[in-house]
Regions:
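Catalytic domains of carbohydrate-active enzymes, especially glycoside hydrolases
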Residues: 73-98
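Glycine-rich, aromatic-flanked loop segments that form ligand/cofactor-binding clefts
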Residues: 45-49, 87-95, 125-171, 208-210, ...
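Glycoside hydrolase catalytic-domain groove-lining segments
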Residues: 234-283, 293-358
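Aromatic-lined substrate-binding rim segments of carbohydrate-active enzymes
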Residues: 96-144, 239-254, 261
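Active-site-adjacent "subsite" loops/lids of carbohydrate-active enzymes
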Residues: 57-69, 147-197, 295-296
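Substrate-binding cleft of secreted/luminal carbohydrate-active enzymes
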Residues: 312-322, 342-417
Length: 418
């Protein structure tokens, strides 16, 4: 995920929270409700999630090369913490760089486990995560990255069996990373097959993608997909329209294939939160963001909602209230209006990682900033929950921002919406 800025204050509150009777003690509505018809809305459930990132060992495992027992213990600790904080979902990254945290017939084992891509860690993290999450009354959303292959540009560093080495024609370097080329139909089919293997074999609750589609722009560099455009793009007005169609096809087809593979598994996407600025498109948000997903990532997030191709969207509204270029309140209101009437669930990605970071603006030094986000969200009828980035920041809680959220808004456990 793109988080551009990639403790002890909560210890007393966390220690006071009880963990007994977790699944059975869930209620159907939280005890704290705001205006905007919140009581009826939250009777349907409220998502309270946390991302567990595995790429580059961001959250888990804490380092590569730990024993299977140590890795499992760390994973269980994240799940137990989620229960103590009265969360009800974990979003677990299982395909970080075109590799896998399960024994996949399509892709090698992820290097975050052993330090060596393709090396068997001696256990099945996804199977364990699903079982242990469900035993605790938590949903398990399996988080996949469709196109990212590596956070470097040297194919020889990949496992010898990696599909990117077996099919070098699928891969493009850009911005210091390797990506699968979204313009190739065979790539689109392969990445779907690789992800659907997990859907078929594990009782996950949702397939979850983040904000990576075409890569974020890098000044002075071009994504060299001219050959694919010449071969497949003749029906489109320009390359940008063709690229958007490539991503549209991936999203639409994946949603269809998930439903065909396992009934009840939802499909959610957590994009960068600005579709387009109003200055670019009158239908856009009242923002001046430096990135617009429609134009820069070729991800027409608004279309996916309006077409009903996905079950939920979780925009990463990683700004504070009153932020000049992208005010949390304005972006939230835009998404609330965009989702209304579509039947697509709306959750909000929250930047817990910014709370207490001295490099961030003054509002992020206030432990109450995130709690104010949730208070505001309760006045927006479509908002049905929040996901916090990320697990290690939930654990550290530098200035008690997460503890404040729990104290103000999560006084009871509730079920996730279905």
């Amino acid at each position: 995920m793109t988080r551009r800025s990639l403790v002890a204050g909560a210890a007393g509150l966390v220690a006071a929270m009880t963990t007994g009777g977790d699944a059975a003690a869930m209620t159907t509505a939280p005890s704290v409700r705001g205006g905007g018809g919140g009581e009826d809305r939250f009777a349907r459930g409220e998502l309270r999630g946390v991302w567990i990132a595995t790429v580059a060992n961001l959250d888990w495992p804490s380092m590569s090369g730990l024993t299977a027992a140590a890795q499992r213990s760390e994973l269980i600790a994240h799940l137990d913490r989620a229960v103590r904080l009265r969360l009800n979902a974990v979003v677990f990254q299982v395909r970080p760089t075109a590799d896998a945290l399960w024994p996949s017939p399509y892709e090698p084992w992820a290097d975050c486990l052993t330090g060596v891509q393709g090396q068997d860690p001696g256990w099945d993290p996804l199977a364990t995560a699903v079982r242990e999450a469900h035993d605790r009354g938590l949903e398990l959303h399996a988080w996949f990255n469709p196109y990212r292959v590596a956070n470097h540009t040297d194919p020889t560093r990949l496992a010898a069996s990696h599909p990117a080495r077996l099919h070098p024609e699928w891969v493009l370097p850009y911005g210091g990373k390797l990506y699968y080329n979204p313009g190739l139909p065979e790539v689109r089919r392969f990445v779907q097959d690789a992800m659907l293997d997990a859907v078929r074999r594990y009782e996950i609750d949702a397939v979850h993608w983040d904000d990576y589609f075409y890569p974020y722009p890098v000044t002075g560099q071009e994504f060299q997909d001219d050959a694919a455009y010449e071969r497949y793009g003749s029906a489109f007005a320009n390359k940008a329209a063709w690229r958007r169609d490539n991503v549209d096809r991936l999203v639409r087809e994946m949603g269809e294939r998930i439903r065909e593979t396992r009934q009840g598994v939802r499909f959610g996407i957590s994009p960068f939160a600005v579709w387009r600025n109003k200055a670019t498109d009158p239908a856009g948000s009242d923002t001046r963001a430096g990135v617009e997903t429609y134009d820069d990532l070729h991800a027409d997030t608004r279309k996916w909602v309006r077409e009903g191709w996905i079950d939920y969207i979780c925009p990463q509204i990683y700004w504070h209230l009153g932020q000049t270029a992208a005010d949390y309140a304005k972006v939230l209101a835009w998404w609330d209006a965009t989702v209304r009437g579509t039947g697509v669930g709306l959750y909000v990605g929250e930047a817990l990682y910014k709370a207490g970071d001295p490099a961030q603006a003054a509002p992020w030094q206030d432990p109450a900033e995130l709690s104010r986000h949730l208070t505001l969200a309760r006045d927006h009828e479509e908002v049905a929950g929040h996901i916090f980035f990320s697990a290690k920041h939930v654990a550290a809680d530098r200035i008690g921002a997460m503890a404040r959220v729990v104290a103000d808004h999560y006084q009871d456990r509730v079920r996730a919406p279905r």
